[in-house]
Amino acid sequence: MKKSLRMTEGSISKKIIFFAIPLFLGNLFQQLYNTADSLIVGNFLGSNALAAVSSSGNLIFLMVGFINGIAMGAGVVIARYYGAKKRDSLQKAIHTTVAFGLAAGAVLTVLGMFLAPKILVLMGTPADVLPESIIYFRTYFAGSMGVVMYNIFVGVLQSVGDGRHPLIYLIISSCVNVVLDIFFIAGLGMGVGSAALATAISQFVSAILCMVHLMRVEEEYRLELREIRFDSIMLKQIIQNGVPSGFQNSVIAIANVFVQSNINAFGKMAMAGCGSYSKIEGFAFLPVTCFTMALTTFVSQNLGAKQYDRAKKGARFGVLCSIIIAELIGVIIYAAAPVLIAAFNRDPDVVHYGVMQSRTIALFYCLLAFSHCIAAVLRGSGHASVPMIVMLCDWCLFRVSYITVAVRIIPDIRV
């Protein structure tokens, strides 16, 4: 039975929602196994270990985010050829994307292993947290090939409208991650590196499952191992669409690393508290993330099929839904912040910092939803450079300049 979803026909709202639902569930489970690290580490290994995991998070996103941005650009190219029903071009785009992922995963592994200590020191990671941060970071990047290839394969499946299989495989890998976390840390008494090891193993599991499915599917997007190679024309298109998205992710990550370095200056309790909030924010923003992913695929497929009016109507629907849902969630986070933060670590200082972070940001989720959805529409239409420039000005120039000045004038983490 055909599991992909053509966005070029049928009810616009139903197509977007039905595609977004498995994306939401998949991202929910992904957040669950990311959060499992923090919950288990925080409760079994203490605040130092939790701070180590938290301090590595933005740095990991910096290095992985660029690669994932390229994968997003590849997804736009694949979705457009799928919508246009150009099988040969679709095949070349898919196999070039996989070849790129293999090369990028190898480079990322080497860079992550060697650059970890220097970057963590530059971020101002406290001396008592630094050793565990390095262990977590290096262990994670030793398995970064699984992380990269999982995102590549999922990007291929989602670009042709298949959200069901990534969901199934992600549920399996999430269960593997949680079981391994408990076994390594609670059962064997292993340290913080075992949390990263559990995540890496689970990502490899999901990547392998996605790859096997793509090799077995009887569709025009079938993966053939012998066909994995670079096609210069496709690589150029992928880079043109992907580099702006990758750079955008890196800009956000660089700004977050800078913010993290300022958080580090407030001590390990602030690091743990703000790290706990970041996990909550990951859950809170899931609906918006799913609508942005669905919008990019919807717009790409419809533009490929030259259904321009349908693409516009879908974009308007997705943006409006995201804004409403995001603000409702923000209100809930604001009200329930103390209980949510305490789930990660009950230390009063950790909860204090986490609640401050939550209540400073939560009510502005609607603005984030609007900007992310507009960026998704622009990416889907092949104008990825526009959100890249906006993010560069907003997240990097304005945000970093503001923090540099504000923290020195008002030494309060809420600024």
Identify the residue ranges that each predicted region occupies.
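Small-residue-rich hydrophobic transmembrane alpha-helices
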Residues: 50-110, 147-166, 260, 274-337, ...
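Hydrophobic transmembrane alpha-helices of multi-pass small-molecule transporters
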Residues: 62-65, 109, 177-181, 207-211, ...
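Helix-terminus/linker motif at the lipid-water interface of multi-pass membrane proteins
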Residues: 28, 32-51, 120-127, 183-190, ...
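Short alpha-helical transmembrane segments in multi-pass integral membrane proteins
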Residues: 1-20, 78-145, 187-243, 299-364, ...
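Transmembrane helical elements of multi-pass membrane transporters/channels
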Residues: 18-37, 139, 150, 173, ...
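Transmembrane alpha-helical core residues of multi-pass small-molecule transporters
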Residues: 57-60, 104, 172-177, 198-206, ...
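Structural signal for membrane-spanning alpha-helices in multi-pass inner-membrane proteins
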Residues: 112, 155, 181, 185, ...
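Residue-level signal for short hydrophobic patches within transmembrane helices
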Residues: 9, 13-32, 36, 59-66, ...
